[in-house]
From Swiss-Prot:
This is Protein YcgL. Residues 12-96 form the YcgL domain. The gene is ycgL. It comes from the Bacteria. InterPro entries: YcgL-like_sf, YcgL_dom.
Length: 108
């Protein structure tokens, strides 16, 4: 029990749902099964949310594919955070860049 005069701070959690319609798309909300602050159009495009995990944000310094400060701010201000898939890698561009460097190096 906390000592008198000391308030126990509320821990910040987020509940992460995977989209049933869009690969690698996740919706973070503050409470399990509470989508009341998520726009209706976003929910239609997201599809049936599939629970991925419940995650404490306090004390955590980073997330795998999202900026933790942006997630916290979005949860506080709008009640949700939408994580979109990373942009596709341009493998051809990478390959040509590497090949160009190798060609340039061999011409010396």
């Amino acid at each position: 029990m906390p000592k008198p005069g000391i308030l126990k701070s509320k821990s910040m959690f987020c509940v992460i749902y995977r989209s049933s319609k869009r690969d690698q798309t996740y919706l973070y909300v503050e409470k399990k099964d509470d989508f009341s602050r998520v726009p209706e159009e976003l929910m239609k495009g997201f599809g049936q949310p599939q629970l991925a995990m419940i995650l404490p944000l306090d004390g955590r310094k980073k997330l795998v594919n999202a900026d933790i400060e942006k997630v916290k701010q979005a949860l506080t201000e709008q009640g949700y955070y939408l994580q979109l898939p990373p942009p596709p890698e341009d493998l051809l561009k990478q390959h040509l860049s590497v090949m160009g460097q190798k060609t340039h190096d061999t011409n010396k």
